[in-house]
Amino acid sequence: VRATEKFASMYFFCHSPQSAETDVAERGNKRPVWIMGHMVNAIAQIDEFVNLGANSIETDVSFDSSANPEYTYHGVPCDCGRTCTKWEHFNEFLKGLRKATTPGDSKYHEKLVLVVFDLKTGRLYDNQASDAGKKLAKSLLQNYWNNGNNGGRAYIVLSIPNLAHYKLIAGFKEALTSEGHPELMDKVGYDFSGNDDIGDVANAYKKAGVTGHVWQSDGITNCLLRGLDRVGKAVANRDSSNGYINKVYYWTVDKRQSTRDALDAGVDGIMTNYPDVIADVLNESAYKAKFRIASYDDNPWETYKN
């Protein structure tokens, strides 16, 4: 019996309806934030990053010359202060990730609710993008979603570095549909990660037929500094009545002051090598009043309206 069920009856004795309403109102007035553990490429790192405070992870996916997803691997160079060479076979990583996100499993982490796959498609020809999407979908269906039978529950973001590879999205959707599981697209979102002009990104989504589930990244390696100008443009698009963006995240943020700056700019997610740093800042009184760590009940495809 889960603790929440066990103590449900006690809750009604302890809480008046009014205080329950206050809890909901307080939750509704705080922006849900995703603390995104960066470069989680070995199964053992899933526990490590979630235990430090991450409710989301980012994993690199490399492809072979036939557009098969091959390894969870970044390689050199990578962020300052990190080992760049941890890896797993992609399908094995998916199995480990499934355990970490399947309720009832001994490795289950309730707080791990979102996974960003950083798709390293740079070595693929543009005309292989659709194939890469199909093969990626089949790998996820079999090894993560367990062919639709009580698989992992995390939401998935497909992060694509090249706007020219927009057909990856259609290929992914086509494969899930042909395999009989179009409903799993409800758990899938998108990101173009190349720091392109916001208007160009919008056009790529138009070509891809995407009208929702959009995360927009902005950032640079922690070895270099980058301002928040483009983040501001992405946030403005997100908050406009006709924008295409649902969520904005910034990477890679490892320091308290840059965390505060990103939160002040209105981001929904912060990618970091040090989840505990972000969690500490979110506990500061100024930020605790406005933000909270996202849970599974927070739909990552919905634009937050305060």
Swiss-Prot record:
Presence of the UniProt keyword Cell cycle in the record: no
Propeptide: 2-27
Stored InterPro entries: PLC-like_Pdiesterase_TIM-brl
Glycosylation sites (chain numbering): 283
Position of the signal peptide: 1
Record's GO cellular component terms: extracellular region
Cofactor(s) of this protein: Mg(2+)
Stored Gene3D superfamilies: Phosphatidylinositol (PI) phosphodiesterase
Keywords recorded for this protein, A-Z: Cytolysis, Dermonecrotic toxin, Disulfide bond, Glycoprotein, Hemolysis, Lipid degradation, Lipid metabolism, Lyase, Magnesium, Metal-binding, Secreted, Signal, Toxin, Zymogen
Residues the entry annotates as binding Mg(2+): 58, 60, 118
A biological-process GO annotation: killing of cells of another organism
Cofactor comment text: Binds 1 Mg(2+) ion per subunit.
Covalent S-S links between cysteines: 78-84, 80-223
GO terms for MF: lyase activity; metal ion binding; phosphoric diester hydrolase activity; toxin activity
Protein's job: Dermonecrotic toxins cleave the phosphodiester linkage between the phosphate and headgroup of certain phospholipids (sphingolipid and lysolipid substrates), forming an alcohol (often choline) and a cyclic phosphate. This toxin acts on sphingomyelin (SM). It may also act on ceramide phosphoethanolamine (CPE), lysophosphatidylcholine (LPC) and lysophosphatidylethanolamine (LPE), but not on lysophosphatidylserine (LPS), and lysophosphatidylglycerol (LPG). It acts by transphosphatidylation, releasing exclusively cyclic phosphate products as second products.
Family: Belongs to the arthropod phospholipase D family. Class II subfamily.
Protein name according to UniProt: Dermonecrotic toxin LarSicTox-alphaIB1ai
Species per Swiss-Prot/TrEMBL record: Loxosceles arizonica
